[in-house]
Amino acid sequence: MEKIGVIVTAGGAGRRFGGEKPKQFLELSGIPVIIITLKRMVNLPIVGQVVLTVPENYIEVAGDLLSRYNLAGIKLTAGGTTRRESVLRGIRALTGNFSIIAVHDGVRPFFPKGALSEGVKKLSEGYGGAILAVPLRDTVKEVKDNVVISTLDRSRLYAVQTPQIFRREALLKGHALGEKQHLDAVDDSILVELCGETVAVIPGDYKNLKITWPEDLEFAEFLFTRYFAKELL
């Protein structure tokens, strides 16, 4: 089995979440969110190396957590001022010459365990990348100044998740473009798309929550206790 490199991004300051510390260091049943994510990731046979990016002022905190939870094999690096910069720093920190690289949000601890393997299968079919996505369940309106402008065709709209899996050369090409044009990309697939690569979609999971707002933490606690705690406790 070909091993892949994984970048886990936890470089955000969590301004939308509020509180004294970034959301990735908050706990579910006493375990930091980022540790749950990393524990589940490193246990996958397909993963050859994991690089974790965190805010520079949290390097020491993150290092202590990795040691405490027996994750010292994970390489730690400081994130940049944007997500794109953080991912690029993570790519550069990989020591293995991986032909496939996955990028994952550190605050998505409940990713499907088969996602990476499914993504690799898509790449073998000639795609430059593969992303997880789920169909939108709600009607979506375009709104300006609190007035509806249009109703979008929900059947064609998907909510994108991570991990996202890419051929190394496609991801590097995308980030080179992003760096050159100073693009503030919301995810990595858009950079790969802008380079002319085709990105495949594989089924995501509605439980693959990105912890962004304070109310997400309560729901994440429920999901962890109900579905995922047995993997770690």
UniProtKB/Swiss-Prot annotation:
One of its GO terms (molecular function) is 2-C-methyl-D-erythritol 4-phosphate cytidylyltransferase activity. Belongs to the IspD/TarI cytidylyltransferase family. IspD subfamily. Catalyzes the formation of 4-diphosphocytidyl-2-C-methyl-D-erythritol from CTP and 2-C-methyl-D-erythritol 4-phosphate (MEP). It comes from the Bacteria. It catalyses: 2-C-methyl-D-erythritol 4-phosphate + CTP + H(+) = 4-CDP-2-C-methyl-D-erythritol + diphosphate. It comes from Carboxydothermus hydrogenoformans (strain ATCC BAA-161 / DSM 6008 / Z-2901). This is 2-C-methyl-D-erythritol 4-phosphate cytidylyltransferase. Keywords: Isoprene biosynthesis, Nucleotidyltransferase, Transferase. The keyword Methyltransferase does not apply. Pathway: Isoprenoid biosynthesis; isopentenyl diphosphate biosynthesis via DXP pathway; isopentenyl diphosphate from 1-deoxy-D-xylulose 5-phosphate: step 2/6. Its EC number is 2.7.7.60. One of its GO terms (biological process) is isopentenyl diphosphate biosynthetic process, methylerythritol 4-phosphate pathway. NCBIfam families: ispD (TIGR00453). The record marks R154, K210 as: Positions MEP for the nucleophilic attack. The keyword Oxidoreductase does not apply. The gene is ispD.
